[in-house]
């Protein structure tokens, strides 16, 4: 059963405030309307498209990345607390995948996780010294990969252990344990 436009728009506003990363497709399914209707509602209410919402959230939640430039981070960084945790989102595009089966190349998922682990370090120089990774399912073109990283320990030798898990929806698709060297041992906690 369709909801009246005013009521739908009020609910749409609330839904996007609760989850700014929700897609127009998911909203259309939720409200049982077309994607075009959702886009028209968003335009009428001056709610930006998903990519702009992600950038807006990112500017509010990011510490300054010290180890990498913005274009060296694979995916869109949406949350960063240096030496603590970070989150990035990567939309899998055709150029990220094998052409014959539209499955994302493993090095793309690894690069997203590795760059997130490096960006997490509060130092001018950070390098991956060890990585133990597991791919738990194939990721396909059009899927959105959310990588979540957190520092599990800071060692006396100036290295940090970082765990990264990547998800498509609620399903884990990648698990990585990274050891990252930092150049300033005295800054490690």
Swiss-Prot record:
SUPFAM superfamilies listed in its UniProt record: Thioesterase/thiol ester dehydrase-isomerase (SSF54637)
Gene3D superfamilies, per database record: Hotdog Thioesterase, Winged helix-like DNA-binding domain superfamily/Winged helix DNA-binding domain
Cytoplasm in keyword set: no
InterPro entries xrefs: HotDog_dom_sf, Transcription_factor_FapR, WH-like_DNA-bd_sf
Keyword Iron found: no
Functional summary from the UniProt entry: Transcriptional factor involved in regulation of membrane lipid biosynthesis by repressing genes involved in fatty acid and phospholipid metabolism.
Family membership: Belongs to the FapR family.
Protein name: Transcription factor FapR
Organism of origin: Exiguobacterium sibiricum (strain DSM 17290 / CCUG 55495 / CIP 109462 / JCM 13490 / 255-15)
Gene designation: fapR
């Amino acid at each position: 059963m369709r909801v009246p436009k005013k009521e739908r728009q009020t609910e749409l506003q609330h839904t996007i405030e609760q989850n700014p990363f929700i897609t127009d497709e998911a909203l259309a399914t939720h409200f049982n309307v077309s994607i075009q209707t959702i886009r028209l509602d968003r335009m009428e209410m001056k709610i930006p498209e998903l990519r702009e919402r992600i950038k807006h959230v990112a500017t509010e939640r990011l510490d300054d990345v010290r180890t990498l430039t913005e274009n060296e981070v694979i995916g869109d960084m949406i949350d960063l607390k240096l030496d603590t945790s970070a989150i990035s989102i990567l939309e899998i595009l055709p150029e990220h995948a094998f052409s014959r089966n539209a499955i994302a190349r493993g090095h793309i998922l690894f690069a997203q996780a590795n760059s997130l682990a490096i960006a997490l370090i509060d130092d001018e120089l950070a390098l991956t010294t060890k990585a133990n990774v597991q791919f738990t399912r194939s990721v396909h073109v059009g899927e959105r990969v959310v990588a979540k990283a957190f520092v599990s320990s800071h060692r006396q030798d100036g290295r940090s252990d970082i765990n990264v898990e990547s998800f498509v929806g609620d399903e884990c698709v990648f698990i990585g344990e990274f050891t990252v060297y930092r150049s300033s041992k005295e800054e490690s906690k």
